[in-house]
Regions:
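Helix-loop-helix hairpin linking two adjacent transmembrane segments in secondary transporters
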Residues: 140-187
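Juxtamembrane intracellular "pre-TM" segments in multi-pass secondary transporters
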Residues: 2-7, 190-223
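A membrane-interface helix-boundary motif in multi-pass transporters
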Residues: 161-173, 366-388
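Cytoplasmic helix-loop-helix junction between adjacent transmembrane helices
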Residues: 108-144
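Conserved MFS/SLC helix-loop-helix module at the cytosolic interface between two early adjacent transmembrane helices
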Residues: 62-98
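Extracytoplasmic gate region of multi-pass secondary transporters
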Residues: 32, 219-259
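A late C-terminal transmembrane helix in Major Facilitator Superfamily
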Residues: 338-370
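C-terminal transmembrane helical hairpin of 12-TM major facilitator-type secondary transporters
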Residues: 283-327
Length: 420
C-alpha cells in the first residue's frame, strides 16, 4: 500500500481513533460503578451487575473472532460507519431498558459490535501511519484507555447522579453517533483493492484467512504475548478497589483521585515509550518497562515495604500502560496489509478472553478473612509479575523475527524490481 496517498488524512484518522476508542471503552467501563443506580432503578440483583460488563466483554471476544476473517474484505471507511452506528446506536438504546433483562440484552448486543469495530479502526490506523511513526501514533491512540478512566467514568457517575441512570447511555451513545458523522466526513476511503496487491485477494475465503494466520508462527507468538500480558494484568485490576479499602484502609472517597493520578501518568509514559520505539529502542523499552513493573508489583503488594499507595499505584498504571502500548506497536508489524483488521480483531479477542479468565480465576482464588480483609492478594501479585516477565521474554523473541522477515521481504521486492 502506498501510505503517501493517505498522508493528508493521518492526523484526522488518529484523532478520531482516539475519541472513538475513548467513548467505546468508557461506555463499557462505566457500567460497573453505575451498579447501585441499576439496583435502585431497575430492581437489579446485585450479583447480576458483573454479568453486564462480563457479558459484553465475552460477546465482543466471540463476535470479534467470528467476524475477523471477513473484516479485511470491505472498505475500512464503510465498515467503520456501519459498525460504529450499531455500536453507539445500541448504547443509546440502553436508555429505553425497563428491566435488568432488557439492559443486559441491549448492552451485550452493543458489546458484540465493539470487537469488530475496534479491529477495523486499529487496522485503519496501522494502514495510514508510516511504519517509522507507529510507536508514537499508536501510543497516542492508546491514551484512549486512560482518558476513558479519567473523563468518561467520572462523567458517567456525575450524569447519573444529577439526572438519572439513562443519562450516561444517551449522552455517550449520541456522542458516538456524532463521531460517525466525522468518520463520514474526515475519513479517507480505504478499499480492499489497495491491500490485495501486497498479499492476497480481498475475496479470499474466510477459512483461508484464518488458516493463513494460524500457520504463521509470528501470529501465534503475538497472540500469546498479548494473552500473557492481559491475564497477568487482570489478576489484580478487578480487585484493587476492594484491596485498597479493606486491606490498606484507603479512603473510599480518594479512589477516584488515585485513578486520576494513574491515568495522567499513563498518558505521559505512553508518549515517551512511543517516541523511543520510533527511534529503534523496542527491546530496551519492553525490558525496562516490564522489569520496573515487576519491581513495583513485588515492592508494593508482596514485600513488606511501607510505600505510598499513590506512588505504587501511579507507577503500576503508568508502566502497565507504557508496556501495553509498546507491545501493541510491535505486534502491529505482524500482519500483512490484507490481514490487519483480522489480526487486530483476533488480538482483541485474545485480550478479552485472557482478561475475563483472569478475573474469574482470581475471584475464585481470593477469600475474605474474618476481619473483612482479602486473603491471597500477594500470591496473585507474584503470579502477575511472573506473567509479565514471561511476556517480556517472548516479546524479545518476536522483535528480531519481525526484523528478519522485513529484511527478507525488502530483499525480495528489490530482486523483483531488478528483474523487471
Amino acid at each position: 500500500m502506498d501510505e503517501s496517498m493517505y498522508r493528508p488524512h493521518t492526523r484526522s484518522v488518529v484523532h478520531l481513533a482516539l475519541l472513538i476508542n475513548m467513548l467505546s471503552l468508557g461506555s463499557l467501563m462505566m457500567v460497573m460503578p453505575l451498579g447501585p443506580d441499576f439496583i435502585s432503578a431497575l430492581s437489579m440483583d446485585a450479583k447480576n451487575i458483573g454479568y453486564i460488563s462480563g457479558g459484553a466483554t465475552f460477546a465482543s471476544a466471540i463476535v470479534g473472532f467470528l467476524a475477523a476473517p471477513y473484516l479485511d474484505r470491505f472498505n475500512r471507511k464503510h465498515a467503520l460507519i456501519v459498525l460504529l452506528t450499531l455500536r453507539f446506536g445500541l448504547t443509546a438504546a440502553c436508555m429505553f431498558a425497563t428491566s435488568q433483562t432488557h439492559l443486559l440484552l441491549l448492552f451485550i448486543l452493543a458489546g458484540c459490535v465493539a470487537g469488530p469495530a475496534s479491529g477495523v479502526l486499529m487496522a485503519a490506523v496501522v494502514d495510514i501511519v508510516p511504519a517509522n511513526e507507529r510507536g508514537k501514533q499508536l501510543a497516542y491512540v492508546g491514551m484512549s484507555f486512560s482518558l476513558a478512566a479519567i473523563v468518561i467514568m467520572p462523567l458517567s457517575l456525575e450524569l447519573a447522579h444529577r439526572i438519572n441512570w439513562q443519562a450516561p447511555f444517551y449522552t455517550f451513545g449520541l456522542g458516538g453517533l456524532l463521531l460517525v458523522l466525522l468518520v463520514l466526513w474526515r475519513f479517507p476511503s480505504m478499499p480492499p483493492a489497495h491491500r490485495a496487491q501486497q498479499g492476497s485477494s480481498p475475496t479470499t475465503a474466510p477459512a483461508s484467512v484464518l488458516h493463513e494466520l494460524l500457520a504463521s508462527p509470528l501470529f501465534l507468538l503475538g497472540l500469546t504475548i498479548m494473552s500473557l500480558q492481559m491475564f497477568g494484568h487482570f489478576l489484580l485490576i478487578p480487585h484493587f478497589s476492594n484491596y485498597f479499602q479493606f486491606n490498606l484502609a484507603f479512603p473510599r472517597d480518594d479512589i477516584s483521585l488515585l485513578y486520576l493520578c494513574g491515568g495522567l501518568a499513563s498518558m505521559v509514559t505512553m508518549q515517551l515509550c512511543g517516541n523511543l520505539l520510533d527511534r529503534g529502542y523496542a527491546s530496551r523499552t519492553i525490558v525496562v518497562t516490564t522489569l520496573l513493573l515487576a519491581a513495583v508489583i513485588l515492592c508494593g503488594f508482596v514485600l513488606p515495604f511501607s510505600l505510598s499507595l499513590y506512588l505504587v499505584f501511579t507507577l503500576f498504571m503508568a508502566l502497565s500502560a507504557a508496556r501495553s502500548s509498546s507491545t501493541l506497536a510491535i505486534t502491529a508489524g505482524i500482519p500483512l496489509p490484507h490481514q490487519r483488521a483480522a489480526f487486530m480483531s483476533y488480538q482483541g479477542t485474545a485480550a478479552n478472553v485472557a482478561s475475563g479468565l483472569a478475573s474469574v480465576a482470581s475471584a475464585a482464588y481470593l477469600s475474605t478473612s474474618a476481619e473483612g480483609k482479602i486473603d491471597g492478594f500477594s500470591q496473585l501479585a507474584i503470579a502477575s509479575a511472573v506473567f509479565a516477565l514471561a511476556a517480556m521474554l517472548l516479546t524479545l523473541r518476536l522483535i528480531p523475527q519481525l526484523a528478519e522477515r522485513s529484511r527478507k521481504m525488502a530483499a525480495s521486492q528489490t530482486a523483483q524490481a531488478t528483474g523487471q
